[in-house]
């Protein structure tokens, strides 16, 4: 079975993500979580240590991040084979409407990594603005505006969008090299 590496958004996510992990297993994928050393209160806008931890554990892998996990994956999984970024949190340098944020541009990711960008159709304007900018950053991407969904990974349409992305990655991996 192919492997999906999940970047947790906060400490304790493995427990909270159990229903999502079960869903991914039913879709024919194994899962693992990136193991992060959390320092201080989260999110810790004064530290970029998580990004290098993500990079060390995601090289060559299919990586999913949701919310803050998507931000960590975008800035950290620089050598991933494929990214699935769900409802990426708007805490980048460019998000000047956020008083607390990382002073790192969303352009610090790897534009050459294939990426699926997802955002709930009912999420606020700021979330859509950031998702669109991240979408446009990646040279090879798909973009899904998940109908009926707010900021909720468990929404049936969000799960369907993730399954579609996983199927696309699996199909691409199965194609013989030309």
Language model regions located:
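The feature captures the conserved acid-bearing segment of alpha/beta-hydrolase catalytic domains
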Residues: 94-137
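Short, surface-exposed "cap/lid" segments of acyl-processing enzymes
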Residues: 2-30, 35-37
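Alpha/beta-hydrolase active-site loop
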Residues: 41-57
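Histidine-bearing beta->alpha loop at or near hydrolase active sites
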Residues: 38-39, 146-153
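Gly/Ala-rich beta-loop-alpha elbow adjacent to hydrolase catalytic centers
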Residues: 64-69, 73
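Residue in the alpha/beta-hydrolase core beta-strand immediately N-terminal to the catalytic nucleophile
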Residues: 61-62, 82-84
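Post-His helix in hydrolase/transferase enzymes
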Residues: 154-166
């Amino acid at each position: 079975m192919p492997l999906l590496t999940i970047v947790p958004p906060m400490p304790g996510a493995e427990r909270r993500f159990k229903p999502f992990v079960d869903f991914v297993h039913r879709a024919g994928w194994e899962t693992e979580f990136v193991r992060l050393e959390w320092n201080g209160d989260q999110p810790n806008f004064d530290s970029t240590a998580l990004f290098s931890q993500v990079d060390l554990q995601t090289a060559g892998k299919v990586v999913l991040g949701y919310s803050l996990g998507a931000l960590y994956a975008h800035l950290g999984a620089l050598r991933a084979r494929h990214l699935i970024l769900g409802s990426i949190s708007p805490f980048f340098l460019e998000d000047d409407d956020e008083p607390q944020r990382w002073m790192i541009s969303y352009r610090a990711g790897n534009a050459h990594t294939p990426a699926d960008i997802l955002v709930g159709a009912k999420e606020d304007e700021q979330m859509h603005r950031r998702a669109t900018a991240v979408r446009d950053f990646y040279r090879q991407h798909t973009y899904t505006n998940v109908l009926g969904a707010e900021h909720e990974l468990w929404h049936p349409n969000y799960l369907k969008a993730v399954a579609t992305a996983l199927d696309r990655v699996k199909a691409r991996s199965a194609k013989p090299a030309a």
